[in-house]
Amino acid sequence: MRIIVADCCAEYTGRLSASLPLAKRVLLIKADNSLLIFSEIGSYKPLNWMLSPCTIKDITPQDADDDPATPTPEKIIRVQSTKTNDVLEVTLQHIYSDETHDLGTDPGLRKDGVEDHLQRYLAEQIERIGEGAKLVRREYPTAIGPVDIMAIDADGTHVAIEIKRHGGIDGVEQLTRYCELLNRDPLLAPVRGIFAAQTITPQAQVLAKDRGFDCLLLDYDDMKGTDDGALRLF
């Protein structure tokens, strides 16, 4: 990762045109040649950027110096997209710092409480959907994708469970498609559905009820064993 702190201005040309006036900013240049320009204030998003695949070229103008008072810039960085004619040209009028660091291989972001965790905990504690319930399997395969959990309730009825962190109408529609498909299989039918999530929107609750599904609110801390909160089935 190359990190440059500089007084700079920038021009983006191609499918759109944009410019940044001269100001002190931070430039990040990644190993894939992506370039991102950040300022001190504003959102987490860069002010301007060029993403990979692209080529990058450092240009040192003739008579370049590090005096910010002179009109000649220290360096120009030109980034060209390899798929389009888009070009981002950054003029570095004065460079305060230009350093390169090898960050190594990143293990990636590990999220806590996301759908995979919820699925695993609910599979391990399947009686939370009802006393006497038994797990068939996680990621139950179908022709249109895997159902998060397939179970059998105390009455011997198959139960398809769709799990979301935040449950909305799209999740209910997804569960509907699964149940419609599964109910065509005489070895499984009847299959009822449960829509499970940490939060469920009122609209999703109404739609789920209309489709004949139960809604299950998941308390992640309780399932993890760090709280005494209760799940609610309604």
UniProtKB/Swiss-Prot annotation:
Function (record text): Cleaves both 3' and 5' ssDNA extremities of branched DNA structures.
Lineage of the species this protein comes from: Bacteria, Bacillati, Actinomycetota, Actinomycetes, Bifidobacteriales
Protein family (similarity comment): Belongs to the NucS endonuclease family.
Pfam families assigned: NucS_C, NucS_N
Disulfide bridge map: none
Keywords: Cytoplasm, DNA-binding, Endonuclease, Hydrolase, Nuclease
Class of enzymatic activity (EC top level): hydrolase
Cell division recorded as keyword: no
EC number: 3.1.-.-
Name of this protein: Endonuclease NucS
Location within or outside the cell: Cytoplasm
Domain of life: Bacteria
